[in-house]
Design a protein with these regions (language model features):
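Active-site helix-to-loop segments that bind/position phosphate- or nucleotide-bearing substrates
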Residues: 4-93
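Internal, well-folded beta-alpha domain core
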Residues: 91-245, 250-257
Length: 257
């Protein structure tokens, strides 16, 4: 089983965790070209393009200016991203075996690097899927990557057993020809909902935390079968068979009234 996670907007340049080995991103050349094009934008342009405040725009202007410099810090992707999902995944106590298993059974989406393995070494950046770079065919990052990633992604899923546990956000489907993905491999999408006033509600922060916790559960337990996911429980979230089907695994917190 292969797990797919979304990249995070926040990144770190240092980590106390030491990975057992580093690998080169498979789309390093494309990432370098994208970063080069992004380095042409001014701070004001980045602020508008990335829909961020001035402080974040300045930070990422500096990142892109230094992206190709030899001294620019880099980290394995699993340690570089610092969003809620990755805080909950929490690889601080990962053994060498855990990292090696993750390398084969976890993939991270990236608008800059395309598709990453956990130990692929990356540099800090920020990018959105709807950014259009004229020098790269005047298309969005979603369109740019779709033709490049789909075959590689399907091959990765097949090598991991032919089953995809999709824990990425919905927008990340647009990085791939998702109809082909669903046709050629089995896709299971866990959902996390909270009972509120007798109705199911989706709370973004709980969804992100649960995605990180479930990924940790899968990697630590070497879960290779969708049925293994049904044993996941965290902070009251448990598998709800009555709301689930073969493609959608629903986990709820609490009971309906």
């Amino acid at each position: 089983m292969l797990v797919l996670l979304s990249c995070a907007k926040t990144m770190s340049e240092t980590s106390k965790v030491k990975a057992p080995l580093n690998t080169v991103p498979r789309f390093q050349k494309e990432a370098s070209e994208i970063a080069l094009q992004m380095s042409q934008f001014s701070v004001d342009e980045l602020e508008r393009l990335l829909r961020v405040n001035a402080k974040i725009a300045v930070e990422n202007y500096k990142r892109y200016q230094a992206f190709h410099a030899e001294a620019t810090p880099e980290l394995p992707a699993l340690l570089a991203y610092t969003g809620i999902v990755f805080k909950r995944l929490n690889p601080k106590d990962f053994s060498v075996e855990d990292f090696e298993y993750a390398q084969e059974h976890l993939r991270l989406t990236s608008f800059c690097y395309g598709l990453l393995r956990p130990l692929d070494v990356i540099r800090p950046y920020r990018l959105e899927g709807d950014v259009v770079l004229p020098e790269l065919g005047n298309q969005t990052m979603f369109s740019y990557w779709q033709s490049r990633l789909t075959d590689v992604f399907i091959q990765d899923v097949r090598q991991a057993g032919g089953i995809l546990c999709n824990l990425a956000s919905d927008e990340m489907k647009s990085l791939f020809d998702w109809k082909r993905v669903e046709k050629e491999v089995r896709v299971v999408t866990p959902e996390f909902h909270v009972w509120k006033n007798g109705k199911l509600a989706t709370i973004v922060v709980y969804t992100k935390m649960s995605r990180g916790e479930m990924t940790r559960f899968i990697l630590k337990n070497k879960a290779g079968n969708p049925d293994d996911l049904k044993g996941f429980s965290w902070e009251g979230f448990e598998f709800d068979e009555s709301l689930s089907d073969e493609r959608k695994f629903v986990f709820t917190n609490g009971k309906g009234e």
